[in-house]
Amino acid sequence: MQFDRRTLVLGILVAGVAGGFLLLPALSLVGSLLAPSQPTPATTHVPLLVGEAIWARGLGGRATELQPVNPFTIARMASCHLLAERSDNQAERDAQHDECFKLIPAVQAIGYLATVHMRSEGVWQDPRVPFVQIATITKLSSTWTRAELLDSLAERGEFPLGFIGADNASRGYFGRSAAELALPQAALLGSMIGESRIDPWCHPERAAALRRRVLERMRDNLAIDDAAMELANRSELGLTAPPSNHKPCAD
């Protein structure tokens, strides 16, 4: 399951219309009644650099806390996305959408964690999904802290080649724990959460591009400076040997 920009933008636009009629609280209530459970925060803490990389991946911006998803914040973001769609330039449009997402910090990451939780509870591909997802996103955004979100993403996030959790993925990719990673590897790790199409051993250029995007966002978030960003971007990926069950790369 990926951080799906197109699906999320469409959902925000639809929710914005619903929010304009103050339907979001009702939808959230229905979803809460249909949900088997709500996620609980992780008890282990994500290392600082990895957490900043995941925050950048989820478009948290410079915010230090989450912003509640409610009819007013949804309507504001929906208006922003509608304005962004007016641009004829794809790159400019994508950049504007990124800025719109920051109006509700890390809403992509919140939506992703909600989806991971729903699938773990067996609520997937059935009629309850839209209601439960709205309820879960609303609950997480209004009651969790930034730290709780990052800790839970690091613990439960899915990474390429079937790794679950940032520490497991770090040991698989780099041969050491997430706490031991330097900036280049922490940024690469954070950039791959929620990805399924990137094999860093087979697609090093694509992996490096993902890392650069996260490094640029970390710089924009003031988590790192220009010099650190450039040095990390020039660094090798730092991968260890692929796991024994790794399939050969296609030609």
Enumerate the language-model features and the residues they cover:
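Peptidoglycan glycan-strand catalytic modules in the bacterial/periplasmic cell-wall system
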Residues: 39-223, 249
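Short loop/turn and capping residues at structural boundaries
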Residues: 150, 229-230
